[in-house]
UniProtKB/Swiss-Prot annotation:
Gene: yidC
Protein name as it appears in the record: Membrane protein insertase YidC
Lineage: Bacteria, Pseudomonadati, Pseudomonadota, Gammaproteobacteria, Pseudomonadales
GO molecular function, a single term: membrane insertase activity
Subunit structure: Interacts with the Sec translocase complex via SecD. Specifically interacts with transmembrane segments of nascent integral membrane proteins during membrane integration.
Region of interest (Disordered), residue spans: 32-80
Membrane-spanning intervals of the chain: 3-23, 354-374, 378-398, 445-465, 485-505, 522-542
Membrane topology: Multi-pass membrane protein
CDD domains: 5TM_YidC_Alb3, EcYidC-like_peri
GO cellular component entries: plasma membrane
């Protein structure tokens, strides 16, 4: 019996340890409380900083750095100083996006995700990219280098022209293309093209260079993510645990390398990569750049004042007079949806970080998603998943409950042994083991199902915590977000009550101290579960109800079989 309780308590300790400590060590990054200094305006901040992206050595042997002006700069000889701000930004609307593109530089400075609310009680769409006086998060791209309009030593940015100030994906259309045009003083026509598709968070960015001048044109394509150091606005802490906030670089040699704000502040990345990607991650969402397949790129990080800049630069593209060329890359600005990310680039789906038990979490997620497709409710899908898991462990649980039922049946004999050999623990232990052997009882049998199901429990926690599909997912009545704690603590209380009923079916430990501890377990678990996601508490509650039914049936059966047996 002592061994059984030790294993049980050890198992419970493992649950606490793995669910809190592992997340804190591997995934939780302390979120800085210091937001980047407020800018008096996006225009004024743009003129005060330089963003230095080092060109690849093969076309910049001298190591010269070309300043790339940040989005928002109005310093351009081509710009109209009286241009209204309303005319400066181009609005692009699809079924999933509302984007704002700055004509100065042609960069995406704002993105609203139309299918995701800012918060549970808000009807405003979630903003991922933004450029305000207090927040900066941008998707930039440009042409730098010798002749690149974004790489002039004067720090000027090209001012693009567009056919209209508003583009919208029309009904019946599946694709939308936005062409921004700029002509250099030497006569080189540059078209910056954005291509978007229906039901897609993929943004294809390309430059078409038409060299109408008399000299060869040379420039380097670059893509960047620019972000301040503000905390994650979409983070939904659970048990004080927050999702990873920071940068990730993927290369064939190192498919998933993290750089948090501290790393980005202390060291500068500068490495040549082919077939890789870089991204900035926050809870449920990410922004990523994926260079073209088999295209060599120089991945870099740097600072722009208080802002972090992470990006890449292609080797130089040379366009002879009278010739044309096209160069570009793919961006992703949106939710962490495994299937979409998996199709976009190798290892990009790993940004949905299910932890070291991913080999359990991933199948659980796909099964849960399949159930949701059948019933259309994530809460009901969790219940069906619980039934399935219970069915998988049915025989193991039955063996455990039979062992506990037999322990309950021989409880009077155990009490008698304690009375006879209470002062001789060694003799008492020998007699107890002899009794277990005679009655074919496994003293560890009652703990085994709990230990075996722990990985499932922990994996489901990560599924609920990381899956954007469960963000703001309602169940019924007062449960409107399964990824967050029950606001009224009703589910944890019901779970505690079910655990109390289940404990009453177990044999009473002969040790009074153990008996008191076991009586307190439902209360301890209830308090522990108060801050768990409602979906996880729902899983545990349904599992308890199914376990009670199975255990009650087996206990009654064993008691009937041993009713006339004397010890």
């Amino acid at each position: 019996m002592d061994i059984q309780r030790i294993v049980l308590f050890a198992g419970l300790a493992i649950v606490s340890y793995l669910m809190v400590l592992a997340w804190n060590e591997d995934y939780h990054q302390p979120q800085t409380e210091q937001v980047a200094e407020a800018q008096s305006s996006s225009d004024s901040s743009a003129t005060n900083s330089t963003d230095d992206m080092i060109l690849p050595e093969d076309n910049n042997a001298g190591g010269e750095e070309f300043a790339t002006p940040e989005t928002g700069s109005l310093a351009s000889t081509s710009a109209n100083s009286d241009q209204d701000l309303a005319d400066r930004f181009i609005t692009v609307t699809t079924d999933v996006y509302e984007l704002k593109i700055d004509r100065v530089g042609g960069n995406v400075v704002d993105s609203s995700l139309l299918q995701y609310d800012e918060s549970l009680d808000s009807e405003q769409p979630l903003k991922l990219l933004t450029n305000t006086s207090t927040r900066t998060y941008l998707l930039e791209s440009g042409l730098i280098g010798r002749d690149g309009p974004d790489g002039s030593q004067a720090g000027e940015a090209p001012v693009f022209q567009a056919e209209t100030g508003s583009y919208q994906l029309a009904e019946g259309e599946d694709e939308l293309t936005i062409n921004l045009v700029y002509t250099t003083d030497s006569g080189v026509a540059i078209t910056k093209r954005y291509h978007l598709a229906r039901n897609s968070y993929q943004i294809d960015v390309s430059y078409l260079i038409d060299n109408r001048s008399e000299s060869p044109w040379q420039g380097n394509f670059t893509g960047k993510i620019v972000r301040d150091q503000a905390p994650d606005p979409t983070s939904q802490a659970s048990m004080g645990i927050r999702a990873y906030l920071g940068m990730v670089i993927s290369t064939p040699e190192d498919p998933y390398e993290k750089y948090d704000f501290e790393d980005l502040s202390e060291k500068r990345v500068n490495q040549s990569v082919t077939n890789g990607w870089l991204a900035f991650l926050q809870h449920y969402f990410l922004t990523a750049w994926i260079p073209e397949r088999d295209q060599k790129a120089q991945f870099q990080t740097t600072r722009r004042g208080d802002l972090h800049v992470m990006g890449f630069v292609y080797p130089a593209t040379t366009v002879a007079p009278g010739e044309t060329a096209e160069v570009g890359a793919t961006a992703y600005v949106g939710p962490k949806i495994i299937d979409r990310l998996e199709a976009l680039a190798p290892n990009l789906d790993r940004t949905v970080d299910f932890g070291w038990l991913f080999f359990i979490s991933l199948p659980l997620f796909y099964i849960l998603e399949w159930f949701y497709g059948l019933v259309g409710n994530w809460g009901v899908a969790i219940i069906l998943l619980t039934v399935l898991v219970k069915a998988v462990f049915f025989h193991l649980s039955a063996t455990s409950y039979r062992s506990m039922a037999k322990m309950r049946a021989v409880a009077p004999q155990l009490t008698r042994l304690k009375e006879l050999y209470g002062d001789d623990r060694q003799r008492m232990s020998q007699e107890m083991m002899a009794l277990y052997k005679r009655e074919k009882i496994n003293p560890l049998g009652g703990c085994l199902p709990i230990l075996v199901q722990m990985p499932v429990f922990i994996s489901l926690y990560w599924v609920l915590f990381e899956s954007v599909q469960l963000r703001h997912a309602p169940f019924m009545l007062w449960i409107q977000d399964l990824s967050q704690m029950d606001p009224y603590f009703i589910l944890p209380i019901l779970m505690g009550a079910s655990m109390f009923i289940q404990m009453s079916l177990n044999p009473t430990p002969p040790d009074p101290m153990q008996a008191k501890i076991m009586k307190l377990m439902p209360l301890i678990f209830t308090v522990f579960f108060l801050w768990f996601p409602a979906g996880l508490v729902l899983y545990w509650l349904v599992n308890n109800i199914l376990s009670i039914s199975q255990q009650w049936y087996i206990t009654r059966k064993i008691e009937a079989e041993t009713a006339g047996k004397k010890y």
